[in-house]
């Protein structure tokens, strides 16, 4: 089978289904691909294809995830669905599947359940920016008032976690009936697709964001000055641009006097490229791995933050024993480890391998960070956890 050509013409948006176990996330995923393929063309994915999710390893963590793709007339969607609750937790914390928006699936027969709440909270913590709700199994509820009540409950729950519960789209449908080809329910899947198109804004591309380059290596070239190398994380840097060197110590400024790639001089370095940047007036000893080169004013160094964390299980190669208050592992940000002290939440005495929780971290050196930045927790070079900066404190 020939590979279909990847069409760059349409905006590419990443979404995923979240919600309580057995509320119909995978059935909905199958229904979306099936109904959209029938309506707009494209390939359908069967339920058992999606449900039989392959295991992937992201930063040493085993996650089962299914990836499907579908098109609306204006967009191309990449959609992730996870079989188990633990997979969602890991996926959202590691950022293995970054979501521009999420489809929260709530069964009308049950209303919001514990994992519904947990997924909304996780979405808030890890920075899923937009939620669209699909109320599933509405064919099994005859009472119109009951449907309204469930919708109200879901909206209130979303508002509680600072999503705009009153304004976001809620579609009442039945994934199973749509999958079986019943027209009135197929129409609800189209309505959901239209809600994704109109409610989730087109994501800002990495290249359009402010320039940032995590420094991997520093060289001194006699007669030319100091060169830092790394992969541009976002934005574009042009020869002549002023930059800040942020993290580890006090922020300094410099000017990029040259950009090289594969020993060739270029005018610019763009997101995704491995480059060397020549810095004017910067000494070799002033720069180190772990700092970032960034557009002035675009990012600040911080030492204290609230983290949402998943602690690896023993089977994943994590710790075999719990940790307690006073735990001081290394936090690996981008290119380097920084030691940090962990402050456990009130009432939590110990943390077991396989747990997920939030706690406050105080680093011994500042790191350039924004909320949403991912990190690994390591002990002597071995990964024992994964986390995301949920809230910067200082």
From Swiss-Prot:
Domain of life: Bacteria
Annotated segments matching region G2: 60-64
Residue segments, region G3: 81-84
Keyword tags: Cytoplasm, Elongation factor, GTP-binding, Hydrolase, Magnesium, Metal-binding, Nucleotide-binding, Protein biosynthesis
Residue ranges of domain tr-type G in the record: 10-204
A GO MF term: translation elongation factor activity
UniProt catalytic activity: GTP + H2O = GDP + phosphate + H(+)
Residues binding Mg(2+): 26
Enzyme class: hydrolase
GO cellular component: cytosol
Residues holding GTP: 19-26, 81-85, 136-139
Protein location: Cytoplasm
Protein purpose: GTP hydrolase that promotes the GTP-dependent binding of aminoacyl-tRNA to the A-site of ribosomes during protein biosynthesis.
Subunit-structure text: Monomer.
Protein name (Swiss-Prot/TrEMBL): Elongation factor Tu
Species assigned in the record: Pseudoalteromonas atlantica (strain T6c / ATCC BAA-1087)
């Amino acid at each position: 089978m020939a590979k279909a050509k990847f069409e760059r013409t349409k905006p590419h948006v990443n979404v995923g289904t979240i919600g309580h176990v057995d509320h119909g996330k995978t059935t909905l995923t199958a229904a979306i691909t099936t109904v959209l393929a029938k309506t707009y063309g494209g390939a359908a994915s069967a339920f058992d294809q999606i449900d039989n999710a392959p295991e992937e390893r992201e930063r040493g963590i085993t996650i089962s995830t299914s990836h499907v793709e579908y098109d609306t007339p204006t967009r191309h969607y990449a959609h992730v669905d996870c079989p188990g609750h633990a997979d969602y937790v890991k996926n959202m914390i590691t950022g293995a599947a970054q979501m521009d928006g999420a489809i929260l699936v709530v069964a009308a027969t049950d209303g919001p359940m514990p994992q519904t709440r947990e997924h909304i909270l996780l979405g808030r913590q890890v920075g899923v920016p937009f939620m669209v709700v699909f109320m599933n199994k509405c064919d099994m509820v005859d009472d119109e008032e009951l449907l309204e009540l469930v919708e109200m409950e879901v909206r209130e729950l979303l508002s509680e976690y600072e999503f705009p519960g009153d304004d976001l789209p809620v579609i009442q449908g039945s994934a199973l009936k749509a999958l079986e080809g019943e027209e009135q329910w197929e129409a609800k899947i189209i309505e959901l697709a239209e809600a994704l198109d109109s409610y989730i804004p087109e994501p800002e591309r990495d290249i359009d964001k402010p320039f940032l380059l995590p420094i991997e290596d520093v060289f001194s070239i006699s007669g030319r000055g100091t060169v830092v190398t790394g992969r541009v994380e976002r934005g574009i840097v042009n020869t002549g641009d002023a930059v800040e060197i942020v993290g580890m110590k006090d922020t300094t400024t410099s000017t990029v006097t040259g950009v090289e790639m594969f020993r060739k001089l270029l005018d610019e370095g763009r997101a995704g490229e491995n480059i060397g940047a020549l810095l004017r007036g910067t000494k070799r000893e002033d720069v180190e791995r772990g700092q970032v080169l960034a557009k002035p004013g675009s990012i600040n160094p911080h030492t204290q933050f609230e983290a949402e964390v998943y602690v690896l299980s023993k089977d994943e190669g994590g710790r075999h024993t719990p940790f307690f208050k006073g735990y001081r592992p290394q936090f690996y940000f981008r290119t380097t480890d920084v030691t940090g002290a962990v402050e456990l939440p009130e009432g939590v005495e110990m943390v077991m391998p396989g747990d997920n929780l939030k706690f406050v971290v105080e680093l011994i050196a500042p790191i350039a960070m924004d909320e949403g930045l991912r990190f690994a927790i390591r002990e002597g070079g071995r990964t024992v956890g994964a986390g995301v900066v949920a809230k910067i404190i200082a």
